[in-house]
Amino acid sequence: MERIEIVENGLFLVFEIADDKCFKFLHFGKKPFNEKDIIARSTSYGFRFVEINLAGYGRPYERHGNKYIVTAPGWHMRYESMEDGRNQNGRIVMFVLRDEITDVIVKSYMQFYDGLSIIRFWNIVENTGSQTQVLDYISSFNYEGIDKEGSLPADKKLQIRIPHNGWQKEVNWKTYDLCDFGMERIQPACDQRSSNLLTVSNTGNWSAKEHLPMGYLENTQTHTGMLWQIENNGSWHWEIGDQNGHLYLAASGPNEIYSHWFKNLKPGDTFTSVPVAVSLTDQGFDDAVGTMTKYRRIIRRPNADNESLKIIFNDYMNCLWGHPTAAEEFPLIDAAAEAGCEYFCIDAGWYADGDWWDAVGDWRESKKRFPNGVREITDYIRSKGMIPGVWLELEVMGINCHMAQEVPDDWFFMRHGKRVYDRSRYQLDYRNPEVRAYADSVIDRLIKEYGVGYIKMDYNIEPGIGTDLHADSAGDGMLSHERAYLKWLEAVFKRYPDLVIENCSSGGLRMDYAMLSRYSIQSTSDQDNYRYYCTIAANSPSALTPEQSAIWSYPLREGDREEVVFNMVNAMLLRIHQSGHLAELTQERRDLVKEALDIYKTIRKDIKNSVPIWPIGLSHFHDEWTCLGLQSENKIYLAVWRRNGNKPVIEIPFEQLNNKEVSVSCLYPSYSEVLFSWSKESNVLTVTMEKEFMARLFCIEIK
């Protein structure tokens, strides 16, 4: 028996090579390994670093239900070799495991990042044998023993935070105990193995339509936590189950049971799993998200947009609602320029005379809406010092688009010999080079003919499990399309490095870091009620970096000045998506918009380097008070919202400022009209807002 111990960036990992070469992952934590923490140490098939399932091979050991544990040949993979080196990010470790029966090998990678308590995990499966193998599951991250530290049973000490995500109610974290999922601990300690399983999955092309591809596990006894994100723009899966007296966490991309995915590996073929990043903390959720935020900045495509954080005006939300005309655009352009916007995006509808939902795909201007052409509008936008943009939806084609009747079926997702469609649209298949060429031609034409520098790339359907045309399985077709789309997107950015493309999917239904490592900006929601939007805004930096999180601000025609302030504060610590009928606001309210944008331009240099904090916790949609902080080395920007309720006073604690000299100011609005005070003794900021539905932006300077 041999041990491999890795200590890197405050992380402790312990692997074991048994005498029969079985490879075990015994420890992953913020503290050194304690052998006594393992209950069922003698179990021969436990603590596997990789779970892999090939069709046609038996599992000799007990498991219950649909757990991806005791997989075959995962249970008898043998250690072969290890490589340990460094690259530009930090240390990188690779283990080679082999199944002697099938001659399938797995290369398991761990990428460390200097100074960060986080690891990116992925696996490459290679068939080095002589027979075709059917791969239907490969873990990206697999760790048994997530409950082993601390003396209390798991159901008394573990809490799971799950980020629910849905249309108009994105980034909605909820906290659960194991008992909430029927996972009470009632079996003998060494034999805990039930059929209960906590699973969070996505099946389809909307990667975040029900949940974000993330999770957080907290051990409340040891005050440690684990935050993970699965980096795939389609189907993914994570599960927590019990086996061998311990709980395990397994995270992966698509699989056969939940995603209709399997892949035939012919001799010599390889398959690379989706990456999973895991951050460990002994300082709480905020610290784990801060680490993840820094990691997300590292893996993201270098781009000017995330350095400049320019302000976008978009004519859709609580404004033109997808029915633009030249006559309506001109006053909006004037008002947006006067307020200080830097991009102006013409949203949906510019390409159709009337109803357009089921006819999209040609992407040519409507002469009825724009008699002198869209170029007249984009030229006017540029004359006002702004960069023009337009809305597109390039992964779909309406069933009544003339092109859809002219191109062959292999342009689209197919199942059972029929085209796949949803909501009167067909799903385009980016594996097809003709589809990619068509998409390129649209991008090229809009840039050359209209001079656009910004594209809002929307996506409003869910094609389900995938396509079985030219694929081993529907899920295989789906994953191959998604990876082809990412490669196409990378090629677009290579051709047009200054082009900004916004990731939108009915709002935030594809918030994942396969997409967001390419896209510089993300639409977070279609939420059209600013009073609810503050919850999405406050929580959004848990899902993506603040400088990628586009938040709508849409002052209403009939509102008052506090309504404007609330709207603006929603967006001021993130990316501003300005909208609303600015030209029709009173001068006082227009001035408040301009004041907010002017202030934003002075603080955005700090936003791109800050990490988020939630001094009173993550927000929920019916909380009376909500706040979000962005912390840098010497200051904290703090957005505070009061909704309805009978509590005009909130005390906001800042334990991290203990024994530090600070000064507090209200940045926005300039008229303030709220009371606030700082207690040096208790490190608490007390804020009083006498009216309901008020918001303010503060700055806490650390001296």
Question: What role is predicted for each listed range?
Answer:
Residues 257, 315, 319-406, 437-441, ...:
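Aromatic- and glycine-enriched glycan-recognition loops and surfaces
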Residues 10, 123, 268, 381, ...:
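Conserved, mostly hydrophobic/aromatic
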Residues 340-350, 438-471:
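Active-site groove signature of glycoside hydrolases
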Residues 308-310, 321-323, 367, 394-445, ...:
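Active-site-adjacent "subsite" loops/lids of carbohydrate-active enzymes
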Residues 263-282, 693-701:
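Short Pro-Gly-centered flexible turn/kink motifs
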